[in-house]
Amino acid sequence: MKNVLNTDLIYEVLSVVEEIPEGRVATYGQIARLTGRDRNARLIGKILSMSAYYGQYPCHRVVNHAGRTAPGFLAQKELLLAAGIEFRPNGCVDLKKYRWDC
């Protein structure tokens, strides 16, 4: 049951997120693939939305497939800008330039 939200899965996802280097971003889909859940990018988003309950993780480094930040995570863009990540005029991260090469 790979789609079951359990503590092991949560920490597996968060351990991958911890590996994203400063100055880089990953997509929900990348994290899903790296955890063996290729078709579960939304599940990754759900886990990251609850990450504060599990400690300090750099979840601000995860964006959607187009480079958009998470709605409702108002500090995300500021944190990325502080790390030197630039945004295109459309408000998205330039994934060709800043995507984590994992």
Give the predicted meaning of each segment.
Residues K2-C102:
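Nucleic acid-binding interface residues in structured DNA/RNA-binding domains
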